[in-house]
């Protein structure tokens, strides 16, 4: 990887920042070591600016590539996203379920109260199996072609959508039986094609209001978390997809006293079929692959963050973590030579 990169790893025991240097890695800083990091997102045009959410604490911003941090919002922060069309606009989601927006890089915030005005038939599904049994906003998707369109993944609770930057909302969860939703994104180049990773399946829809269908042919797993897209290899081809999977949910791993049996799968046909990826990795990974993130300058290169921990839970000690990297669209992988606690989230920015 020729371009310099800075990695931000949000772990079960705080945040660690590294920078690539002389074909190796140099630790830049550590922070929030008494906290659990559940969200990270950086700016597209200002790589020095990154946002980090600390559970039961607040949202923090760095303007100097992770050297110093400023608290900009208090709360149990579970998700953060920067508008892909404007680095000034940030959304953050919390537990219990609520959404906030800033138009000035996080200096001031406004809650979007319409989310809490959804019908009781929708809101009754917002819960979590661990105390205090409150759902949270796990993932925020801002449509890159129309930033007025927002999707929220509620863990647990389903998917809700807004066409007006959060002034009004509708539930679009039909077709997904178990509403433990992790990540949603649209297929690049296809405005209305969406995919969802959940705790009980991987789904697709060309109009979420009409329902979701499974897209799991060849996967052989039932738990899904992060996924991303690679640029098409040639004109007329679909973007390739890479998804992180496991056998059973974290509750099953604990009850059976085993690891996640995690694996990576890849699709070149819009999720119609999947093939095993991940040469260089064990057949069944004990830690879960919680995070997938592109190299900021090399879109065929991807980092993966692994952690022996349960995402969504904002307590516990967790086990070991690891970061691995692929330079060939997810086919072959090798360890990044750095040590860290169980990773939960990951961000890569230009250095």
Residue ranges and their predicted role:
Residues 1-351:
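Extracellular glycan-interacting surfaces
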């Amino acid at each position: 990887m020729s371009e310099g990169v800075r990695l931000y790893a949000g772990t079960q025991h705080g945040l660690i920042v590294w920078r690539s240097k002389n074909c190796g890695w140099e630790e830049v800083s550590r922070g929030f070591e008494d906290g659990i990091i559940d969200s990270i997102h950086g700016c597209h045009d200002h790589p020095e600016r990154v946002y980090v959410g600390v559970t039961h604490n607040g949202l923090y911003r760095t303007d100097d590539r992770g050297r110093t941090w400023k608290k900009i919002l208090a709360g149990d922060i579970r998700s953060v996203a920067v508008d892909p069309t404007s680095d000034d606009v940030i959304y953050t989601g919390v537990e219990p379920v609520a959404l906030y927006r800033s138009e000035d890089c996080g200096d001031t915030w406004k809650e979007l109260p319409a989310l809490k005005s959804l019908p009781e038939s929708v809101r009754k599904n917002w819960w979590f199996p661990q105390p205090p049994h409150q759902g949270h906003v796990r993932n925020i998707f801002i449509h890159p072609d129309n930033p007025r369109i927002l999707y929220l993944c509620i863990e647990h609770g389903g998917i809700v959508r807004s066409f007006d930057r959060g002034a009004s909302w509708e539930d679009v969860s039909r077709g997904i039986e178990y509403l433990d939703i992790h990540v949603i994104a649209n297929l690049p180049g296809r405005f209305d094609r969406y995919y969802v990773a959940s705790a009980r399946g991987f789904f697709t829809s060309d109009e979420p209001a009409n329902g979701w269908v499974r897209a799991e042919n060849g996967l052989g797993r039932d738990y899904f978390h992060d996924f991303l897209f690679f640029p098409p290899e040639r004109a007329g081809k679909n973007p390739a997809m890479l998804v992180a999977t496991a056998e059973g949910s974290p509750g099953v791993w604990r009850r059976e006293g085993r690891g996640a049996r995690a694996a990576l799968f890849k699709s070149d046909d819009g999720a119609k079929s999947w093939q095993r990826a991940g040469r260089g990795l064990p057949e069944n990974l004990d830690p879960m692959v919680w995070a997938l993130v592109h190299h900021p300058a090399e879109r065929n290169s991807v980092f993966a963050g692994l952690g022996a921990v349960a995402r969504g839970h904002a307590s516990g000690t967790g086990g070991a973590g690891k970061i691995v990297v692929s330079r060939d669209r997810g086919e072959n992988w090798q360890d990044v030579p750095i040590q860290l606690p169980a990773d939960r989230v990951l961000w890569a920015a230009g250095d």
